[in-house]
């Protein structure tokens, strides 16, 4: 092996392909004719190389290279030209490919495809292939439309001609491929074709480096074209000499399948040269794409055809057929699999070459075939199968698609004929061999292919007809069209394909579609280049290749024509196809050789008139109907119109209007688009014969003017106008090249045969935007619409006037309100429209654009919706449809009969006419439904009309839609027709139902109006109807309900009944609708009920509806029903209820019947009402104590709902019946008006309430019980739990007991009996059953009773039972005084609980006076229910008397009595609720007795009887009693509970000595926490006395009357100590207090001891009150223990106990000192006389100063004196500085706040200056020691947390006023502030208040500089020492300063202040 040469330039780029040609390949090349053999070998080598995919660097031995170069040297110049073209193509910017996602991706995947360009045949071949690939990979620049690069004049060479289109740089690659496949052998063509596909795939896969385009090759002069085909080199060994810098690489030109130019090669070559020149200029120009690319010079073509045409021309048609005039078509006999169209024209020279090289070529083709097959498989697996083909396609020049390879779809292998998607190319080939659609279209394609496409206007003249015409053979087996080109073929007809083409092959081979323009596109060999690629890709997706290729190539050509670059608009070519024109208007129609050569390498894209000489108008509509074609069209249109590179290109599915970003996405969408598939199915099922499509005028690229909607509308309008879908004449918009596709060409592709699915909705958005939309029919407008501006669009105006009918449909279409695809069916039917229809549609479309999505337009109201689902939803509610529904039926027949009279025989024409019937229906707006579904499949007009009509009816209830469908049905598929029929049937049914409903509604409304005069119409409650109205009266019941509702409302004014509701159970007692006594468990279907009547109705009077019951109680307002309620119920039971039970409105007929029955029942009911009204009047007369408002309420009820009154006034017997009868099953459900109301009202009422009256009736009749209806409790039957409302009970039962509604109704919950009275206890259920069994009364429901009910059910201590009798008597007396009306009830309540129950039971059973007589009206109920204490209603409090609670508290004190009555009252109610009735009564009696005693001796009564009742020393500590007396005497105003104090003194907390302060604080806190103003003054006692008399007023009076005293209240230590000294200092505390207890003011006789004793628990074990508040800091604690523990460390308490408390103690010394202090305190207790004097002073003192003076009089040793003094001083300072609206929360609760709170007044002490949270409730753990850091304090704590809190809050050193002033020189420290001011402050104080400052001081010694002002810091210190109160003005500054210097105590104070005052946004303050 000689030296290995590395490839450079293009060869280097081909390296990725690993194109190492084996020696044998080189030898083969040697054996072959330089051109043909070389091209073949090169192709084969390239394929083989691609297949080999050798990774080794592409290196060939020198010998190999030499051989190859020698062989290719002869044609080197031509190869250079080819290479140049290729390189130019390769160098073409990839940008143009952007639009083509597939191309772009492929180019990215195969960037190196361009590397294959090598000089020589190999180079030419490989370059052609590679350039082809490159084209695919890197689409040409915008100037390079679809590979229409301007090639150098040398491009006319065969290599250039075949290797690459003269107009495309891919031509080189095509030449390569062509030459490769240009073998003489037919097999060679087959193999070559396949190999090209596969090579293209492989090469595309392998060539991943377009980045390195081969160095531009010198453009060879066109003169070289005359030479034989230059050898196409698949491998380029050496880099070609760089092209002249001044010479620009030829711009890429459209790569079309090899077009065989006939013998007139010179002329054709000239044309090619001209085209090339024009292309160059176009390349230089911005819009080179618009300029037709010159085909290879005719001379080159001729030479190619004459010379070894097989070599170069034989280049597989798969590669874009070079401009060579002749392509040799291998005999069709060749296996289709290997069949590759011969690329060499059947020239003698080519044949000779073929003969010489036949063996080699065959062998090479075999290799190539294998390679290509393998590559194709690999590509298919990798999704690149399509890409290489497009590359090849782009590479090849205008070679006509000789043998369309199975079009590998871009990722989708779709049959071009039937649009069937296949998994891979092989399957596609197989499918296409047997594809009926393809076979059907094959003849047409053959004819089309035989005809040469019209040359572009600018293209050089097509080769003269003398040029050998190519015979086009389509091999089904391979799916490739093998076209043998005869130079004799005419320039236009057979310039590319000879009319002598074997139509058998084409017809038999579904792949002929390629020749139609699709196959070659699919065939990268046939159609290469970016444009070709995109087109091919689309064509692949555009299963119908013939048309899409034409469209796409036409687009490519139309790039010359000014159409957007297909690369820029990937679907642009599709647009042409989508448009009826399918770019039929493309230069093909021009029939100019240049255009033909340049613009339409793939003849199909030639003018619509000629598809390779085929008159598309002559083409059967089946092609257009072919879904594949449509797809391809749409795809082609979209790609051609928008170009892949055009990002703006919008690809819109014409079927569903969905826009996608790329062709590939659009294709994928087609796979899933149901509408599209429907149309495809329609087209596939009945593919109407191809009709001529009108030439597509220049398609306005992406013009939205002709939107899809307009296309659809236009199609519909055209159909409506019944304009035959005759292909419009090539009224083509002049493309920039003055190209006008022939209508022939357009029609077949535009949708002649295929309903322009692609055009109508397959075409891209741009297509839709373009005229494509107008052209598209409703569903299937021909792709023409999407093509370049359709001439149809221009023609549309003419067409429209032709058949413009004023049909609503047409108007809607014009308005674009009608969407052709109003229904999926409409789409399908529209798809049926022929191309002519499409054309018509297009014309119409232009005139009418759809503003929205015309597909989804309501045919009734013309409203456009965004989706079919919305449209359907809209139809359901369309008012117009409803109004027109009746008319629609009439209009439907016209629409149905309306059939396209002018419908052409072709299905498309029929489809187009099908819309016309839609115009006929204009009779009804529904007929104008825009949903004209045109099915591609042709349906006989009659059948279609029938289907359409039925379908329209099914699809749209609206006649218009039906009409549309009927008309469109002619084109509808059977499925569409069936769907339309079904839809129509559904619509008819809906309309009928609606009509019936309307009729029923009218009737009902009429009935209601008639009844409205009497009763507001209301749907009878089935149960209510049964119960309330006899079955015969069921309808009447409805009216009654309606009539009763107004009546019921007045009746139920107390609980205004909710407005009558519809529904069975919906009617609640509030509506007076008696909840039928029939339990739901028993509820039956309407029939059963009607037959059986109500179950329990007879047993109980029915609700107001149960007029018979009311009739018993004559209701004047209801005179219609005379039957008594019971009788009425019996009637219900005996009578079958009509189906009325269901709301009559539910069933119109039933409703009518019900209304009738209601009317009758109402008449009867009125009679009963009259009777009931009378009864009710009588009952009302019996109502004695009924409140006036209730009387009015009942009167109103009488007037409005006699039934209610009747029930209200029903006899007790009725009540008994109700009690006996189970509540209505609805009772448990209906809770709107709780039975509690009825219970309250009716419990006291006679039976009618208890009878099956509705809750409303019962309520109205019954006097409101003392408790409100909302307060009525109910008992769960299962667990006997009481709930506040029936609803809650029901919920409970359903949730907990898992009961069903029926079960609940069967066993409804019963109201909890009111313990207050028998009536209340009876608590009739809120059911028809009336009062529940008295057992419920027995049940203690008082748990939820109000305080007013407490007397009967209040909780009383067992001890109180002994006194129960006396208390009951007292209560009875007071009740009689308070409520004479309640005398009976009160007596009953006063009786033992069983007795009231019995009474209740009796009340339930025996007829009782009306509830009003028995029960007081709700206003007095608070009084009545409570123990009747006359003045304050303390009857309620007595039951609830907090004294009773205080009895339970550890330290009974005035706190309980002084506590606001509100607080006191709730306690007793709770106790009464949860206690036995005996206890309640006992408590009530006690309360009454206490009241009397309080009146007699308020102080002692309160203290002994209520507060402590210390008569029993065992129950109460004598200390507490003594202290209380002292308080009464004013001696111990400031002393807390002595017991607590003593307790604190006796026991220490945390091992600390318990000073009196601590004990006192604990005591105080206990008292306060218990809520006892333990230190209340006598005034406070008097306040309590007042409270007892006026509990509601006392809370205010007490604090107001004794604010001073309250302020003084908290000096417990002082008062206590003084008192102890006065009493017996040496004596034990207990003894000391015992004596005072004996001393009681004679003026105050003690209250009855039994009461106190029974009502009180021993105070020795006080129960922690709800408020466990620290007396010092007011912090609320959770338990007494917590409180005591808190007191031990509470700074306030400590201060109160020890004035020097803050001093840091020396632990032991401190303890000892504490003990000593305690002893001193005890010893220094003032003597009794001092105490007396002190008490006198306290009585006189009105301010804190007086208290301080009194304290000062005490001996100095007394800590209490100091504390009091300090506290008073603090109070004064707080008064001065407190500017806040509320007491500074953070401060140590200045005592000034205490007076405001009566509760806290007793608990608050002068020492408690901080609020609970302020005083350090929140600890801080910044202290690690448990000792107070101040030795003076001497405190130690059990935890660091407590110590920190102590340091912050409790330490005297920190809280002492002026403590920050140094006490000694050693204690001073100089503070220097930012204002240079200097202050001396106590070091100890600073260290105490701030750990941070302490740290600083430790570091800095005696000086400390602070970055703040002295004023600010002083404020901080003053706040800390309580000199200054925190206010809203200073809070901000204080907060900042405290945080800055870490004064935790101040920080907490500030936080507390903010929290208490809700101070969220502190005001601005002085900045530090």
From Swiss-Prot:
Cross-referenced SMART domains:
ZnF_C2H2
Task: Say yes or no: keyword ATP-binding present.
Answer: no
Q: Which organism is it from?
A: Caenorhabditis elegans
Task: Please provide the record's keywords in A-Z order.
Answer: Cytoplasm, Differentiation, DNA-binding, Metal-binding, Nucleus, Repeat, RNA-binding, Sexual differentiation, Transcription, Transcription regulation, Translation regulation, Zinc, Zinc-finger
Q: Where is the composition biased (Basic and acidic residues)?
A: 570-594, 1388-1403
Any one Gene Ontology MF annotation carried by this entry is:
DNA binding
Please identify the protein, giving its name as recorded: Signal element on autosome protein 2
Q: State the SUPFAM superfamilies in the record.
A: beta-beta-alpha zinc fingers
UniProt note: phenotype after gene disruption: RNAi mediated knockdown at early larval stages and in young adults results in an extended lifespan. RNAi-mediated knockdown results in delayed developmental defects with an increased number of seam cells in young adults. RNAi-mediated knockdown suppresses the embryonic lethality of hermaphrodites in the double fox-1 y303 and sex-1 y263 mutant background.
Q: Which InterPro entries match?
A: ZnF_C2H2-type_TF, Znf_C2H2_sf, Znf_C2H2_type
Q: Where in the cell is it found?
A: Nucleus; Cytoplasm
Summary of the function given for this chain in its UniProt record: RNA-binding protein, which regulates the expression of proteins required to control developmental timing of events during the L2 to L3 larval stage switch. Binds to the 3'UTR of the transcript of the heterochronic protein lin-28 to post-transcriptionally negatively regulate its expression in certain tissue types in the later larval stages. During larval development, controls the timing of seam cell division and terminal differentiation into adult alae. In vitro, it can also bind to DNA through its first zinc finger.
User: What happens on changing residue 1398 to D?
Assistant: In bp283; extended lifespan, and a slow accumulation of dcap-1-positive P-bodies compared to wild-type, indicative of a slower ageing rate. Delays the L2 to L3 larval stage switch
The residue ranges flagged as biased composition, category Basic residues, are 107-119, 690-702
């Amino acid at each position: 092996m000689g030296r290995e040469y590395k490839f450079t330039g293009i060869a280097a780029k081909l390296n990725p392909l690993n194109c190492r040609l084996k020696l044998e390949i080189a030898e083969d090349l040697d054996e072959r004719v330089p051109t043909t053999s070389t091209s073949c070998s090169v192709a084969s080598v390239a394929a083989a190389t691609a297949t080999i995919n050798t990774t080794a660097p592409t290196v060939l031995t020198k010998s190999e290279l030499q051989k190859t170069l020698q062989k290719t040297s002869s044609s080197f110049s031509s190869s250079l030209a080819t290479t140049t073209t290729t390189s130019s193509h390769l160098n073409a910017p990839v940008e143009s490919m952007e639009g083509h996602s597939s191309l772009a991706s492929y180019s990215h995947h195969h960037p190196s495809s361009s590397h294959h360009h090598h000089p020589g045949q190999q180079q030419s071949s490989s370059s052609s292939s590679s350039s082809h690939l490159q084209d695919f990979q890197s689409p040409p620049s915008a100037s390079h439309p679809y590979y229409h690069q301007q090639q150098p004049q040398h491009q006319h060479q065969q290599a250039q001609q075949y290797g690459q289109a003269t107009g495309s740089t891919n031509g080189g690659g095509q030449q390569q491929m062509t030459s490769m496949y240009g073998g003489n052998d037919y097999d060679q063509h087959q193999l070559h074709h396949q190999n090209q596909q596969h090579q293209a795939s492989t090469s595309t896969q392998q060539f991943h480096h377009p980045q390195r385009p081969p160095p531009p090759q010198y453009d060879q002069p066109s003169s070289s074209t005359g030479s034989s085909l230059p050898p196409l080199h698949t491998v380029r060994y050496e880099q070609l000499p760089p092209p002249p810098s001044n010479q620009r690489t030829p711009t890429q030109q459209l790569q079309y399948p090899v077009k065989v130019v006939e013998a007139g090669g010179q002329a054709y070559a000239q044309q090619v040269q001209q085209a090339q020149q024009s292309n160059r200029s176009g390349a230089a120009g911005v819009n080179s794409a618009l300029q037709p690319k010159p085909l290879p010079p005719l001379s080159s073509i001729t030479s190619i055809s004459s010379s070894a045409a097989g070599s170069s021309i034989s280049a597989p048609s798969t590669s874009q057929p070079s401009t060579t005039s002749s392509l040799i078509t291998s005999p069709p006999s060749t296996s289709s699999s290997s069949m590759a169209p011969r690329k060499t024209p059947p020239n003698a020279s080519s044949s000779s070459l073929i003969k010489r090289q036949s063996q080699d070529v065959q062998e090479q083709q075999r290799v190539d075939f294998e390679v290509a097959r393998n590559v194709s498989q690999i590509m298919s697996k990798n999704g690149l199968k399509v890409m290489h083909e497009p590359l090849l396609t782009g590479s090849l020049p205008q070679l006509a698609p000789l043998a369309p390879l199975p079009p590998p779809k871009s990722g989708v292998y779709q049959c071009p004929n039937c649009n069937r998607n296949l998994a891979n190319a092989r399957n596609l080939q197989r499918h296409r061999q047997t594809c009926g659609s393809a076979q059907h279209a094959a003849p047409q394609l053959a004819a089309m292919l035989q005809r040469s496409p019209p040359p572009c206007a600018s293209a050089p003249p097509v080769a003269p007809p003398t040029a050998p015409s190519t015979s086009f053979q389509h091999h089904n087996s391979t799916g490739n069209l093998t076209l043998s080109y005869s130079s004799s073929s005419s320039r236009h007809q057979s310039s590319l394909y000879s009319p002598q083409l074997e139509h058998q092959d084409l017809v038999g081979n579904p792949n002929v579609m390629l020749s139609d323009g699709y196959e070659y596109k699919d065939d990268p060999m046939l159609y290469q280049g970016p444009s070709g690629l995109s087109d091919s890709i689309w064509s692949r997706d555009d299963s119908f290749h013939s048309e899409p290729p034409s469209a796409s190539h036409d687009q490519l050509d139309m790039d010359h024509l000014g159409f957007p670059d297909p690369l820029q608009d990937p679907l642009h070519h599709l647009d042409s196809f989508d448009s009826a024109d399918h770019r039929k208007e493309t230069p093909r129609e021009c029939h100019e050789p240049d255009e033909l050569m340049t613009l339409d390498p793939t003849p199909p894209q030639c003018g619509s008139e000629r598809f390779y000489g085929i008159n598309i108008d002559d083409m059967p509509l089946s092609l257009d109907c072919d879904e594949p074609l449509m797809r391809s069209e749409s795809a082609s249109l979209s790609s051609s119109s928008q170009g892949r590179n055009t990002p703006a290109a919008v690809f819109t599915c014409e079927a569903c209007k969905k826009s996608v970003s790329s062709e590939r996405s659009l294709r994928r969408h087609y796979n899933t688009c149901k509408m599209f598939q429907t149309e495809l199915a329609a087209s596939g099922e009945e593919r109407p014969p191809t009709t001529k499509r009108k030439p597509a005028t220049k398609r306005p690229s992406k013009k939205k003017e002709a939107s899809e909607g307009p296309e659809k509308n236009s199609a519909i309008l055209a159909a409506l106008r019944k304009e035959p879908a005759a292909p419009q004449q090539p009224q083509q918009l002049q493309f920039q090249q003055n190209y006008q596709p022939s209508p022939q060409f357009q029609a077949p592709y535009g949708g002649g045969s295929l309903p322009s699915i692609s055009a109508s909705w397959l075409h891209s958005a741009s297509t839709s935007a373009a005229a494509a939309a107008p052209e598209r029919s409703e569903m299937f407008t021909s792709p023409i619409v999407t093509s370049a501006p359709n001439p149809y669009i221009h023609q549309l105006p003419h067409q429209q006037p032709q058949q413009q009918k004023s049909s609503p449909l047409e108007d809607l279409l014009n308005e674009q309100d009608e969407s052709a695809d109003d229904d999926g069916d409409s789409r399908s039917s529209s798809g049926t429209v022929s191309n002519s229809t499409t054309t018509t549609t297009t014309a119409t479309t232009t005139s009418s654009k759809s503003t929205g999505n015309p597909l989804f337009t309501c045919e009734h109201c013309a409203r456009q919706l965004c989706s079919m689902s919305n449209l359907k939803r809209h139809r359901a509610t369309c008012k117009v449809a409803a109004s027109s529904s009746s008319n629609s039926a009439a209009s439907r027949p016209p629409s149905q009969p309306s059939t396209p009279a002018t419908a052409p025989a072709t299905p498309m024409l029929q489809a187009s006419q099908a819309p016309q019937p839609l115009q006929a229906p204009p009779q009804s707006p529904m007929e104008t439904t825009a949903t004209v579904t045109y099915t591609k499949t042709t349906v006989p007009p009659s059948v279609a009309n029938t289907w359409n009509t039925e379908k329209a009816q099914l699809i749209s209830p609206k006649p218009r839609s039906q009409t549309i469908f009927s008309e469109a049905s002619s084109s509808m598929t059977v499925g569409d027709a069936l769907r339309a029929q079904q839809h129509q049937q559904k619509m008819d049914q809906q309309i009928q139902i609606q009509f019936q409903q309307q009729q029923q509604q009218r009737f009902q409304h009429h009935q209601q109006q008639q009844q409205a005069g009497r009763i507001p119409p209301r749907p009878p409650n089935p149960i209510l109807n049964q119960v309330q109205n006899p079955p015969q009266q069921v309808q009447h019941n409805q009216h009654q309900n309606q009539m009763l509702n107004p009546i019921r409302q007045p009746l139920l004014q107390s609980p205004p009944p909710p407005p009558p509701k519809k529904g069975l159970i919906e009617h609640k007692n509030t509506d007076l609708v008696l909840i039928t006594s029939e339990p739901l468990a028993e509820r039956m279907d309407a029939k059963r009920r009607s037959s059986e009547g109500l179950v329990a109705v007879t047993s109980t009077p029915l609700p107001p509806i149960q007029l018979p019951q009311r009739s018993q109680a004559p209701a004047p307002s209801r005179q219609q029903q005379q039957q008594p309620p019971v009788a009425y119920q019996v009637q219900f039971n005996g009578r079958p209820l009509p189906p009325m039970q269901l709301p009559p409105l539910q069933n119109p007929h039933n409703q009518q019947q019900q209304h009738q029955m209601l009317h009758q029942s109402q008449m009867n009911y009125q009679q009963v009402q009259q009777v009931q009204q009378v009864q009710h009047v009588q009952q009302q007369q019996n109502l004695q104590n009924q409140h006036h408002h209730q009387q009015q309420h009942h009167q109103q009820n009488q007037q409005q709902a006699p039934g209610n009154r009747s029930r209200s006034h029903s006899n007790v017997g009725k009540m008994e019946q109700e009690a006996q009868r189970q509540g209505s099953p609805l009772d448990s459900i209906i809770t709107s008006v709780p039975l509690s109301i009825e219970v309250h009202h009716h419990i006291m009422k006679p039976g009618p309430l208890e009878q099956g009256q509705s809750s409303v009736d019962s309520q109205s009749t019954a006097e409101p019980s003392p408790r409100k209806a909302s307060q009525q409790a109910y008992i769960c039957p299962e667990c006997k739990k009481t709930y506040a409302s029936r609803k809650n009970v029901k919920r409970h039962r359903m949730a907990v007991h898992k009961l069903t509604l029926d079960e609940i109704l069967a066993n409804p919950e019963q109201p909890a009996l009111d313990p207050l009275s028998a009536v209340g206890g009876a608590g009739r259920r809120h059911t028809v059953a009336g009062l529940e069994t008295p057992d419920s009364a027995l049940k203690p429901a008082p748990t939820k009773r109000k305080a007013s009910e407490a007397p009967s059910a209040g909780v009383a201590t067992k001890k109180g039972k002994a006194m129960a009798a006396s208390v009951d008597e007292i209560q009875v007396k007071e009740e009689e005084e308070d409520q004479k009306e309640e005398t009976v009830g009160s007596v009953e309540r006063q009786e033992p609980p069983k007795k009231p129950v019995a009474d209740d039971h009796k009340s339930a059973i025996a007829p009782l006076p009306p509830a009003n007589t028995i029960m007081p009206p709700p206003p007095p109920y608070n009084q009545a229910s409570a123990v009747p204490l006359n003045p304050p209603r303390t009857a309620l409090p007595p039951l609830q008397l907090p004294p009773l609670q205080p009895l339970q508290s550890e330290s009974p004190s005035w706190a309980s009595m002084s506590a606001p009555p509100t607080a006191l009252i709730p306690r007793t109610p709770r106790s009464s609720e949860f206690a036995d009735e005996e206890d309640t009564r006992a408590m009530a009696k006690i309360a009454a007795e206490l009241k009397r005693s309080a009146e007699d001796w308020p102080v002692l009564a309160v203290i002994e009887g209520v507060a402590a009742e210390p008569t029993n020393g065992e129950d109460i500590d004598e200390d507490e009693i003594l202290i209380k007396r002292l308080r009464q005497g004013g001696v111990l105003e400031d002393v807390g509970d002595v017991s607590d104090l003593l307790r604190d003194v006796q026991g220490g907390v945390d091992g600390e000595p318990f000073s009196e302060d601590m004990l006192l604080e604990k005591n105080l806190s206990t008292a306060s926490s218990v809520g006892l103003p333990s230190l209340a003054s006598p005034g406070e006692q008097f306040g309590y006395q007042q409270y007892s008399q006026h509990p509601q007023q006392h809370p205010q009076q007490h604090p107001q009357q004794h604010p001073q005293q309250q302020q003084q209240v908290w000096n417990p230590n002082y008062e206590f100590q003084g008192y102890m000294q006065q009493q017996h200092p040496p004596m034990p505390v207990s003894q000391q207090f015992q004596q005072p207890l004996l001393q009681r003011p004679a003026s105050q006789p003690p209250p009855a001891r039994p009461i106190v004793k029974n009502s009180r628990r021993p105070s020795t074990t006080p129960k922690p009150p709800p408020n466990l508040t620290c007396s010092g800091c007011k912090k609320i604690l959770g338990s007494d223990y917590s409180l005591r523990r808190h007191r031990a460390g509470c700074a306030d308490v400590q201060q109160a106990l020890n004035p020097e408390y803050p001093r840091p103690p020396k632990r032991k010394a401190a303890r000892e000192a504490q003990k000593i202090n305690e002893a001193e305190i005890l010893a220094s207790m003032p003597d009794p006389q001092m105490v007396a004097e002190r008490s006198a002073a306290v009585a006189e003192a009105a301010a804190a100063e007086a208290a301080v003076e009194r304290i000062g009089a005490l001996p100095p040793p007394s800590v209490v004196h100091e504390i009091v003094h300090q506290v008073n001083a603090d109070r004064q300072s707080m008064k001065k500085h407190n500017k806040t609206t509320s007491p500074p929360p953070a401060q140590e609760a200045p005592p000034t706040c205490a007076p405001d709170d009566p509760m806290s007044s007793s608990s608050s002490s002068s020492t408690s200056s901080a609020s609970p949270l302020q005083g350090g409730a929140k600890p801080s753990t910044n202290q690690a020691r448990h000792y107070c850091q101040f030795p003076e304090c001497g405190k130690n704590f059990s935890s660091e947390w407590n110590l920190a809190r102590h340091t912050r809050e409790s330490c005297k050193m920190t809280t002492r006023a002026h403590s920050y002033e140094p006490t000694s020189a050693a204690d001073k420290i100089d503070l220097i502030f930012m204002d240079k001011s200097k202050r001396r402050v106590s070091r100890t104080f600073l260290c105490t208040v701030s750990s941070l400052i302490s740290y600083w001081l430790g570091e800095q010694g005696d000086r400390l500089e602070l970055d703040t002002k002295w004023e600010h810091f002083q404020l901080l210190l003053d706040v800390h020492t309580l000199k200054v109160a925190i206010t809203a003005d200073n809070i901000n500054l204080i907060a900042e300063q405290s945080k800055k210097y870490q004064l935790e105590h101040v920080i907490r104070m500030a936080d507390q202040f903010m929290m208490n005052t809700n101070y969220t946004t502190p005001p601005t303050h002085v900045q530090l």
